[in-house]
Structure formats: structure tokens, C-alpha cells
């Protein structure tokens, strides 16, 4: 049995056509089904529907053989048991700092609100900047508006939400897209099967990119 971990939303919607190129099609619509384990048209392949931030954990610990996760999630993840063989070039966005429009950055210790705590620590450590990191799980845009933080670090797509709340994107930390991740043990035990899937997905990505 080959188990693939996916999260609902944009990543799932963009991944399903790529899996279809490999003949893997869910037997139920994952967006409408309440099932978290969904069979596919290949009897020995199933999909696990999990939270986006949990995909690397399921894959590293062998609960799933493969998964699709955003590079932002993988940058924040601290585990070691994953291969990252393929950039699927889907769900593209940017991981950026943002602050109030026209605000002057303080010269002293900077307060940064984000759910990407590990990313923030590395980013500012590389700059040699002293920061206090405040972990939030949502509504990041509020933090600079009410004085909780000087800046935020968050995923930015169009930037419309930032601008609607009086913020502006500032420094680019990383360009984000979704990646295929593979459990290291699964890659050894089911190498031929998984490598064939990787090759098929790579061709599908290249074909889509050319068009």
C-alpha cells in the first residue's frame, strides 16, 4: 500500500491533476467527503487528508510514504526523515516580512509576530539582529496595527490582505511552492514504485510548465 498525505485547499486542488497523470484518482471528491482516508482508482494507493503543517510529520514517521507540502511548511519543520525530490511548482507564493505602511523600523530590539518561528529565528540570526518573536496562529495583520509587534512574517500571495489592513510587504525571505516529500525508509523499501511515480510527476510538471 502506498499512502500519500495531502492537505485540503489550493495544494490539494493543484496536486490532483498531477496525480491523475500517474493514474491516481480519488474515488470520492476529497473536498466534499468527510473521510480522511480516501481510496483511489489504484487499489494499492490511498490518500490521507491532514492539516498542511502535519504533512511532514506523517511522512517522516512513516504514517504516509509520500506527501505534498509547501516550502514554507518544510522550512519551519525541524525533522530529518524526509527526501524532497521534486518541486511541483504549484501553490506559488512568497514568504515575506511586512509592516505598517510608512512605519520607521526601531533601532533597538525588533518585535516580530509570526507562526514561522524557526524561520524567523534563522532569518534574523543571519542578519545579526536582536528580535523578540511572538508566535501567532492567524490574523497576523493585526499585530502591527495594535502595537503587539513591529513586523510580521507571513505568506504573501497578492498582497491585497496586507494593503487592506494598512501594511506593506517588505523583505523577501523565500519564494514558496509545493514540494513532493518522501519517507526515507519507504524510498528504500518501495524504491521502484516511488521512483516511477516521481518520474511521472516530474514529466507532468515539465509538460505543464512548457505549456
UniProtKB/Swiss-Prot annotation:
Class of this enzyme: transferase
Catalytic reactions of this protein: 1-(5-phospho-beta-D-ribosyl)-ATP + diphosphate = 5-phospho-alpha-D-ribose 1-diphosphate + ATP
Assigned EC number: 2.4.2.17
Single Gene Ontology MF annotation: ATP phosphoribosyltransferase activity
SUPFAM superfamilies (alphabetical): Periplasmic binding protein-like II
Pathway assigned in UniProt: Amino-acid biosynthesis; L-histidine biosynthesis; L-histidine from 5-phospho-alpha-D-ribose 1-diphosphate: step 1/9
UniProt GO cellular component terms: cytoplasm
Subcellular location field: Cytoplasm
Keyword field: Amino-acid biosynthesis, ATP-binding, Cytoplasm, Glycosyltransferase, Histidine biosynthesis, Nucleotide-binding, Transferase
Function comment: Catalyzes the condensation of ATP and 5-phosphoribose 1-diphosphate to form N'-(5'-phosphoribosyl)-ATP (PR-ATP). Has a crucial role in the pathway because the rate of histidine biosynthesis seems to be controlled primarily by regulation of HisG enzymatic activity.
The family this protein is said to belong to: Belongs to the ATP phosphoribosyltransferase family. Short subfamily.
Assembly: Heteromultimer composed of HisG and HisZ subunits.
Domain notes: Lacks the C-terminal regulatory region which is replaced by HisZ.
PANTHER family: ATP PHOSPHORIBOSYLTRANSFERASE (PTHR21403:SF8), ATP PHOSPHORIBOSYLTRANSFERASE ATP-PRTASE (PTHR21403)
Name listed for the protein in its UniProt record: ATP phosphoribosyltransferase
Amino acid at each position: 500500500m502506498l499512502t500519500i498525505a495531502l492537505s485540503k485547499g489550493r495544494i490539494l486542488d493543484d496536486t490532483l491533476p498531477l496525480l491523475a497523470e500517474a493514474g491516481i484518482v480519488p474515488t470520492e471528491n476529497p473536498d466534499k467527503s468527510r473521510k480522511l482516508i480516501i481510496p483511489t482508482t489504484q487499489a494499492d494507493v490511498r490518500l490521507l487528508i491532514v492539516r498542511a503543517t502535519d504533512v511532514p510529520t506523517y511522512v517522516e514517521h512513516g504514517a504516509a510514504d509520500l506527501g505534498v507540502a509547501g516550502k514554507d511548511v518544510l522550512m519551519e519543520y525541524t525533522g530529518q526523515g524526509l527526501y524532497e525530490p521534486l518541486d511541483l511548482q504549484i501553490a506559488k507564493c512568497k514568504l515575506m516580512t511586512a509592516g505598517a505602511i510608512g512605519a520607521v523600523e526601531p533601532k533597538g530590539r525588533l518585535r516580530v509576530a509570526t507562526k514561522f518561528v524557526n524561520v524567523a529565528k534563522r532569518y534574523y540570526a543571519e542578519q545579526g539582529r536582536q528580535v523578540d518573536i511572538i508566535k501567532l496562529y492567524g490574523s497576523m495583520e493585526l499585530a502591527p496595527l495594535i502595537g503587539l509587534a513591529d513586523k510580521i512574517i507571513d505568506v504573501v500571495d497578492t498582497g491585497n490582505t496586507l494593503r487592506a489592513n494598512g501594511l506593506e510587504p517588505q523583505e523577501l525571505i523565500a519564494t514558496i511552492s509545493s514540494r513532493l516529500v518522501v519517507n526515507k525508509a519507504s524510498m528504500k523499501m518501495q524504491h521502484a514504485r516511488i521512483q516511477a511515480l516521481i518520474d511521472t510527476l516530474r514529466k507532468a510538471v515539465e509538460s505543464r510548465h512548457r505549456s
